[in-house]
């Protein structure tokens, strides 16, 4: 806390909030409520950004007008650092194409997490998008589903901007009852299913329905958390 307070004293743009541990989702919601900037960016406590991460992502959003920027990242496992490397080139992606990519691989980091993305705060506030504090799994993905409902264009940034420290975070490693695990998975499946009904027309949804149902299995992968 003292280090953070030092940054706040040195730079008026830094706001530090001292609070009880109310969980990551509630904490993020409080941060969103206090935010005043044009964009929202999230960083997990074990991870770190490259020095130019925010500059690169904001520049991409401002130059293209995209609602979301998604960047490549580095995965850190112990002392090993490797680049994810799935983004081949900088490019603007329309919502229809982006949703198609999500359906092909919903458990991928590029869709499920917050930390390699930049969001427009105006869009978040206009639609009251918040983290679901009742969930302790896939809450990032649910936030992204809600955001993508209203976003129209997305920018893929090939430059890695984030160091993600890989830890065991799947449901198997959390102290959650089996009944609660099933309840959360079903709730997430309903949200996922409802999302695609919203963004696809009826014929397209029927053609893709089996892919949507695969989510119930894919969501158990560790890629979400």
PLM regions: where:
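Nucleotide-sugar donor-binding/catalytic module of glycosyltransferases
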Residues: 1-190, 194, 198
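Active-site anion-handling motifs in enzyme catalytic cores
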Residues: 102, 203, 216
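Secondary-structure edge/capping motif, primarily at the C-terminal ends of alpha-helices
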Residues: 196-200, 223-224
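Flexible helix-coil transition and linker loops at the boundaries of alpha-helical arrays
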Residues: 198-208
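Non-catalytic, C-terminal membrane-associated alpha-helical segments of glycosyltransferases
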Residues: 209-225
């Amino acid at each position: 806390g003292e280090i953070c307070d030092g940054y706040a004293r040195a730079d008026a743009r830094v706001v530090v909030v001292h609070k009880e541990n109310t969980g990551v989702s509630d904490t993020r919601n409080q941060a969103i409520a206090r935010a005043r900037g044009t964009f929202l960016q999230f960083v997990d406590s074990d991870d770190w950004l490259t020095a130019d991460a925010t500059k690169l992502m904001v520049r991409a959003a401002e130059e293209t007008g995209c609602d979301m920027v998604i960047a490549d990242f580095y995965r850190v496992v112990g002392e090993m650092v490797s680049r994810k490397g799935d983004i081949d080139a900088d490019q603007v992606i329309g919502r229809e194409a982006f949703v198609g990519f999500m359906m092909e691989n919903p458990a991928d980091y590029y869709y499920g997490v917050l930390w390699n993305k930049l969001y427009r705060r105006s869009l978040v506030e206009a639609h009251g998008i918040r983290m679901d504090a009742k969930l302790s799994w896939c809450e990032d993905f649910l936030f992204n589903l809600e955001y993508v409902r209203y976003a129209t264009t997305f920018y893929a940034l090939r430059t890695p901007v984030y160091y993600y420290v890989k830890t065991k975070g799947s449901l198997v490693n959390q102290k959650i009852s089996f009944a609660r695990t099933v309840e959360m998975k079903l709730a997430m499946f309903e949200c996922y299913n409802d999302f695609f009904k919203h963004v696809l027309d009826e014929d397209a949804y029927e053609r893709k329905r089996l892919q949507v149902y695969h989510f119930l299995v894919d969501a158990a992968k560790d890629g979400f958390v």
